[in-house]
């Protein structure tokens, strides 16, 4: 149907003097019986039969204006049900011109006519009719309700959309729409979704983000399954530097499985990293990389490894770091893999990956790679000291690592010199003992 029970405000104003009311009328027995048959046919989804019954009634010479108005109004309803709004409009205008209904019914009819103008894209006529209805409703003591204000706001937004962007005319229509959109949302017990949308669009048109936030918060509460409202609210919070609130909304979206795209899932994982919850970030990245919703790319596997490393889960960082390293064109990630094995004190694996990193090349700091290789070999034990020394000496060839590398060279050479001195001293002692033995034989 056309009509809404929120066309009028719930609390009616004290009535001004209305037009002279017509006596309450009823149909004659014969006309009423046929009229009921037409209604029953409509109820049985037989609109053509209903229309024929009504047409036959209109052929009667003894119809009173009230009966004629009711019959034509029901015919208009038949056309509206068939979505033939042009015809429905013609018939309702005929009823309105008869002026045979009660004043309240005439007022309702005027609103329906305004709605049908809009349904047939006759925006100017609909606007004019609605303004007349507003005036008549106020005069009769029936202040317009939320749905009427929402409709008028929508008309002004339509007019705004037909003007040049950023023009004075566009702004003027938004100004006209605002009080009506505000009344629709704030005066209704349960505002409709599109009323919120209209009011929100007006506030966002002027970048009035502070005012838009409570509206979006209400929309999220009223329509908890609408992803777009959460997304807009998170964006508004971020715009207003309310990053914690923005993150909270995105957490809710994730818990509701509203984040499905690569960028969305990556962003929430990065937010968990930013808020120092790396374990949660790693779980998201791991799950979504395996599902394919986060792309199988080097940087994403590296990010997963970083998350595990930040969570101090060294072993869990190794598989994604290997994947990322294998996809990489340089040796940088193999070097990081070697460092991860160093954290685990797995010196054998650490040495292998650092060597491979140096071999693959294109490192940001090759001198540091040689230094780490030296440390790893040194940790493997005394028999790897010479190869460690070789690595440290290679590291001294890089200016930024020279001082550190020389310290390591000095440490190892000192240890070796000390051992050599100890060896010589031990040999000398043995020789001395051998010489002394002649006196005891």
Model regions and ranges:
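N-terminal leader/linker segments that initiate helical-solenoid repeat arrays
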Residues: 1-93, 100-108, 119, 128, ...
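TPR/TPR-like (Sel1-like) alpha-helical repeat modules
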Residues: 173-179, 221-222, 238, 254-258, ...
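Generic helix N-cap/helix-start motif at coil->alpha-helix transitions
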Residues: 27-36, 65-72, 102-112, 141-152, ...
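Structural motif corresponding to the intra-repeat A-B loop/turn of tetratricopeptide repeats
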Residues: 44, 82, 120, 159-160, ...
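Residue at a conserved register position within TPR or TPR-like alpha-solenoid repeats
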Residues: 41, 79, 117, 156, ...
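Solenoid-like repeat scaffolds
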Residues: 20-26, 58-64, 96-102, 132-141, ...
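Alpha-helical adaptor scaffolds
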Residues: 298-312, 319-368
């Amino acid at each position: 149907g056309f009509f809404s029970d929120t066309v009028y405000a719930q609390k009616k104003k004290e009535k001004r003097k209305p037009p002279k009311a017509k006596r309450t009328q009823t149909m004659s027995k014969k006309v009423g019986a046929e009229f009921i048959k037409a209604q029953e046919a409509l109820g049985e989804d037989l609109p053509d039969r209903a229309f024929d019954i009504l047409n036959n009634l209109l052929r009667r010479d003894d119809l009173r204006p009230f009966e004629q108005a009711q019959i034509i109004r029901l015919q208009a309803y038949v056309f509206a049900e068939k979505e033939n709004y042009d015809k429905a409009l013609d018939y309702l205008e005929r009823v309105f011109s008869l002026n045979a209904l009660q004043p309240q019914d005439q007022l309702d009819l005027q609103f329906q006519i305004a709605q049908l103008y809009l349904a047939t894209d006759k925006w100017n006529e609909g606007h004019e009719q609605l303004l007349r209805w507003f005036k008549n409703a106020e005069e009769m003591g029936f202040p317009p309700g939320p749905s009427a204000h929402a409709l008028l706001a929508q008309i002004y937004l339509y007019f705004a959309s037909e003007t040049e962007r950023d023009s004075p005319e566009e702004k003027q229509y938004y100004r006209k729409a605002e009080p009506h959109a505000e009344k629709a949302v704030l005066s209704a017990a349960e505002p409709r979704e599109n009323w919120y949308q209209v009011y929100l669009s007006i506030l966002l048109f002027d970048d009035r983000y502070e005012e838009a936030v409570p509206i979006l918060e209400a929309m999220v509460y009223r329509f908890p399954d609408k992803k777009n409202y959460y997304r807009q609210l998170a964006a508004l919070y971020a715009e207003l530097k309310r990053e914690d609130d923005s993150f909270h909304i995105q957490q809710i979206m994730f818990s509701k499985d509203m984040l499905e795209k690569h960028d969305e899932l990556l962003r929430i994982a990065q937010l968990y990293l930013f808020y120092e919850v790396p374990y949660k970030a790693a779980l998201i990245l791991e799950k979504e990389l395996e599902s394919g919703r986060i792309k199988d790319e080097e940087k994403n596997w590296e990010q997963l490894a970083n998350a595990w490393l930040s969570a101090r889960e060294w072993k869990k960082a190794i598989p994604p770091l290997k994947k990322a390293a294998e996809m990489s064109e340089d040796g940088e990630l193999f070097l990081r893999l070697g460092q991860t094995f160093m954290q685990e004190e797995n010196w054998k694996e650490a040495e292998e990956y650092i060597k491979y990193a140096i071999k693959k090349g294109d490192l940001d700091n090759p001198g540091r790679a040689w230094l780490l290789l030296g440390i790893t070999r040194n940790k493997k034990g005394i028999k790897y000291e010479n190869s460690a020394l070789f690595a440290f000496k290679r590291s001294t060839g890089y200016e930024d690592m020279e001082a550190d590398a020389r310290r390591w060279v000095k440490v190892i050479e000192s240890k070796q010199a000390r051992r050599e001195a100890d060896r010589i001293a031990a040999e000398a002692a043995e020789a001395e003992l051998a010489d002394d033995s002649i006196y005891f034989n």
